[in-house]
Amino acid sequence: MAALSGGGGSSSGGGGGGGGGGGGGDGGGGAEQGQALFNGDMEPEAGAGAAASSAADPAIPEEVWNIKQMIKLTQEHIEALLDKFGGEHNPPSIYLEAYEEYTSKLDALQQREQQLLESLVFQTPTDASRNNPKSPQKPIVRVFLPNKQRTVVPARCGVTVRDSLKKALMMRGLIPECCAVYRIQDGEKKPIGWDTDISWLTGEELHVEVLENVPLTTHNFVRKTFFTLAFCDFCRKLLFQGFRCQTCGYKFHQRCSTEVPLMCVNYDQLDLLFVSKFFEHHPVPQEEASFPETALPSGSSSAPPSDSTGPQILTSPSPSKSIPIPQPFRPADEDHRNQFGQRDRSSSAPNVHINTIEPVNIDDLIRDQGFRGDGGSTTGLSATPPASLPGSLTNVKALQKSPGPQRERKSSSSSSSEDRSRMKTLGRRDSSDDWEIPDGQITVGQRIGSGSFGTVYKGKWHGDVAVKMLNVTAPTPQQLQAFKNEVGVLRKTRHVNILLFMGYSTKPQLAIVTQWCEGSSLYHHLHIIETKFEMIKLIDIARQTAQGMDYLHAKSIIHRDLKSNNIFLHEDLTVKIGDFGLATVKSRWSGSHQFEQLSGSILWMAPEVIRMQDKNPYSFQSDVYAFGIVLYELMTGQLPYSNINNRDQIIFMVGRGYLSPDLSKVRSNCPKAMKRLMAECLKKKRDERPLFPQILASIELLARSLPKIHRSASEPSLNRAGFQTEDFSLYACASPKTPIQAGGYGGFPVH
């Protein structure tokens, strides 16, 4: 640091000695004054000091640039050290000394850089500048944008180029990630980083250009009347008559046309480009792919011990990073409207979690979310029962219990007393205790599979059933009560696309009994026997899955482990969402307190669930992300991230938001609307994902819009109309082209 400062000071001092004769005429004195000014050790004195300061000022921007390069070089040294020794829990002491030396040097360089920036921005004019006044340089930067557009942004200290140009780019339908920024220096364009401080570029001109590989086109708008459920992509309000881009699917009202992005960006290919560029320039070593300790909850096997030296270095508060990433990680704004309990995750024991605390109004969620789809059908056309329609859950219960207005007209005291007595009787019959199956009534058969929290058997109880024995040998009273509370909600689930809950048992151990499904799982069909489904069948499977999840969410039930292993197909391809687990028995308990830890099927986990930074990461939108992965399996026939064999690397990249499924692998005959829906469900930010009522409406609209092959009207089939073979003898109606025997008609002689 001393050598660096001394060198810089000599350069400035030399300039002072050569340029200011009134300062004493001694080049050495000018050098001393320049060095003092550069190091910030003393204030310049009158006379020679003023001349040296005046001569050194023009060199400050150049010194700032040099310091910036030194900072970059120091950071590279730190990253190289971390690449070499960062994965070791007890690195050598010489490595720690070198690490501390580089970080101290980096802090000093950054502090000196800040001092120079302040002197550059808040510089006061000297006597020479008063004698020769110049127009003050405005702290602005001129920027040339794509499509021959330009703008001017203020050069504020501490603000990056990205933040300064973000608004201007968004108004033109662009994002910084799809553009590159250049500065003009010596007549040449030199690229600069988006995280560069804008104050370093005061008075310069920047050029923003779209990257070559970014699919950027102009919109192709058409007027459209949306007869099904659709929302404006700008104001998020209901859309009936408006416009839609045929390329990117952007929908809007006529009054919102001024807010439409000017450019049409294919974000699917853009995400793929970012991921490929990231892996190309920033490979993640295997020893560094484990998730940082601060992002993993306590108790996770992936987190190193807190008293080791390695994690302290990896999570050091210094500006350097252990792994080079494009920008610092910022967790998405989490939605705290739904307060649900939590539990451990398992790759083979899925879970449906029940919110027994407070019902959730899906209308409010839909209103806040909006949806970027092609629109969809009204939920009235859905085969979903009324309980799955969007709306307040209290209203749904009222609809289920009141068949019509006639019951409301019963106001006599006798009828109301009878109703109350009937309700009490039904309440006693429908209690949770009546759903408990006594010990000895279930005949347990062959073992089907096992997971971290239970084992599934095929059993007999008034027919074939699936019995899931839970790994809880001696439940505490708190666990047993929570288990019964959740069973009280599960017993009310009745839907064609949900495995039927039939009961539970507590002796000899906790177990739940569900309907037995004769078919195989969707995972078995797609990845084991590789069944080749037609596209219309795949879309129907997606529709039924969305319909079942829509019903669960309307019941305030979060699945929390939706994946292709838990979706079963009957022989007639009827979808059954199953493997109901319970959050109570899948959590780590200490007395009456419940704790969480990261485990489960990582391929289907949303980024916010992987991070586990919030007390409550599970929500309706986390199920939507898992459904997006299921859609990816349906449309590609393979699992995501099949090219990455390191589980920790997948956890790190998905949790940080740098890895998403490659949508370019979908089948060629996959509809564009389905691909857009898949991209919406796989949004990295939770609040940007749609909800299942909108997803179901879009899939139903897509299914109705697919071309269907009908029987030709020119080739009728009498069998299809209900005729039997005996009926043909009753009607001697010959075809017009059939030769007619002359014996039937006397007008033709017979020769």
Curated annotation (Swiss-Prot):
Keyword Cytoplasm among record annotations: yes
Cellular component aspect of the GO annotation: cell body; centriolar satellite; ciliary basal body; cytoplasm; cytosol; glutamatergic synapse; mitochondrion; neuron projection
Annotated residues for binding of ATP: 448-456, 468
Annotated spans, Disordered: 1-55, 288-440
Gene Ontology BP term (one): cellular response to calcium ion
Omega-N-methylarginine PTM positions: 656
Compositionally biased tracts (Gly residues): 1-32
Domain of life: Eukaryota
Reaction(s) the record says it catalyses: L-seryl-[protein] + ATP = O-phospho-L-seryl-[protein] + ADP + H(+); L-threonyl-[protein] + ATP = O-phospho-L-threonyl-[protein] + ADP + H(+)
Active site per the UniProt annotation: 561
Ranges of biased composition (kind: Low complexity): 46-55, 297-324
Co-factor: note: Binds 2 Zn(2+) ions per subunit.
Cofactor(s), by name: Zn(2+)
Limits of the Protein kinase domain: 442-702
SUPFAM superfamilies xref list: Cysteine-rich domain (SSF57889), Protein kinase-like (PK-like) (SSF56112), Ubiquitin-like (SSF54236)
Biased composition (Basic and acidic residues): 331-346, 406-432
Role: Involved in the transduction of mitogenic signals from the cell membrane to the nucleus. Phosphorylates MAP2K1, and thereby activates the MAP kinase signal transduction pathway. Phosphorylates PFKFB2. May play a role in the postsynaptic responses of hippocampal neurons.
Recorded disease: Participates in a chromosomal translocation that produces a Tif1a-BRAF (T18) oncogene originally isolated from a furfural-induced hepatoma.
Protein name per its UniProtKB record: Serine/threonine-protein kinase B-raf
Protein source organism: Mus musculus
